[in-house]
Structure formats: structure tokens, C-alpha cells
């Protein structure tokens, strides 16, 4: 991610901040004036296709969206103003998985990030210090498809992922489980740089 993390905001929420415009002081003032007048700013909603535009979102709206983000499905968050696109999946235990397969910039390589319920990044691709990571699609083990030495494993994984019902990630004695609803969003272009 590109900005410094405020102490009150989780890392997964931080990913969403990337989708904000640079006019935070204006939006905060607008929120204050609106609250004096009894007008509540609406929180962006995910449409039926699993997509949401966060281009005109205030920090307060973004925090509310992050708290209430739909679970057990992929959500494609876009900020057309800043040309930032993020794909995330929130589980029942509040863990968030972010797959970044189709990078907007061809110089970037596909990656993933896994955040715990507190929003702390606990796993990412290509980090040898983390030990063994196993990805399971409908209980079929693909080991770690994000292998620096074999892009073929990743291509096979991506192909199988489109039809899988569940994604499980096993690491250090903990199993993370995600439903794979709106899997068609996995083909969307995303911002791959953290």
C-alpha cells in the first residue's frame, strides 16, 4: 500500500484508503456540515455483480464500508479517479484475502495478501521466511502456486479457481476459509503493488 497507516485503521482498511481522492479535508468539512443539517453520508454499497466504486468516498464512509463489507464473496473495489483497483474476499472470521492476478502493469507479478481479523498482514506471496503455505480449492491441495520458479503452477491454479466453491489456506497450524462467490471478478485488472 502507498500511504502511512493511521493507528486507528486496520491494514485491510488501509487498502481501501488507496481508493480515496486527495480531498480529505473537503470531505471532512462536508461531513461536519451535513451532520449539522441532519444529513448522513451514505456508505457505498456493493452491487449485485460484487463491484463498488469508492471514487467519491470519505474516510468515514470508507471505514464504515470496511466494517460492513460483504462476507464470503469477492468484492471488486475501484477508484477510477486514482486508477486503483483492489479485489478482496472477507471470511466469516473477518480474515481478508486479496488475490492480484491480472496486474494493470505488465512489469508486476501476480501476488496475494492475507490479513487477519485485526487487519494485520499475515501472509503474502514470495516471502520465503513464512514457511510452507498450502492453498486448497474444494479440498484439492495446490501447495503454494505463487512459486518463483514455476509460473505453470499459478496458471493451473487460476484456471481451477474460477470453478471452485471454497478456498482454504493452511499455514502454521491455522486454516483460513473463504467462499468463492463472484469468482468471475478474479479476471478483472487490479493494482498489484502493495
Regions found by a protein language model. Give the residues of each.
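Viral structural modules
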Residues: 14-17
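Bacterial N-terminal signal peptides that target proteins for export
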Residues: 2-12
Amino acid at each position: 500500500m502507498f500511504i502511512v497507516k493511521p493507528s486507528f485503521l486496520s491494514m485491510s482498511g488501509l487498502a481501501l484508503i488507496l481508493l480515496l481522492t486527495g480531498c480529505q479535508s473537503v470531505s471532512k468539512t462536508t461531513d461536519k456540515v451535513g451532520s449539522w443539517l441532519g444529513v448522513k453520508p451514505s456508505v457505498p454499497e456493493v452491487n449485485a455483480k460484487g463491484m463498488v466504486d469508492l471514487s467519491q468516498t470519505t474516510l468515514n464512509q470508507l471505514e464504515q464500508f470496511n466494517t460492513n463489507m460483504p462476507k464470503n464473496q469477492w468484492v471488486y473495489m475501484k477508484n477510477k479517479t486514482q486508477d486503483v483497483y483492489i479485489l478482496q474476499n472477507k471470511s466469516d472470521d473477518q480474515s481478508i484475502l486479496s488475490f492480484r492476478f491480472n496486474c494493470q502493469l505488465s512489469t508486476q507479478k501476480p501476488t496475494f495478501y492475507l490479513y487477519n481479523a485485526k487487519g494485520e498482514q499475515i501472509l503474502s506471496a514470495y516471502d520465503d521466511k513464512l514457511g510452507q503455505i498450502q492453498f486448497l480449492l474444494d479440498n484439492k491441495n495446490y501447495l503454494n502456486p505463487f512459486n518463483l520458479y514455476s509460473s505453470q503452477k499459478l496458471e493451473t491454479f487460476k484456471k481451477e479457481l474460477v470453478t471452485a466453491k471454497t478456498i482454504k489456506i493452511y499455514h502454521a497450524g491455522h486454516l483460513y476459509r473463504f467462499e468463492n462467490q463472484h469468482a468471475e471478478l478474479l479476471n478483472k485488472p487490479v493494482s498489484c503493488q502493495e
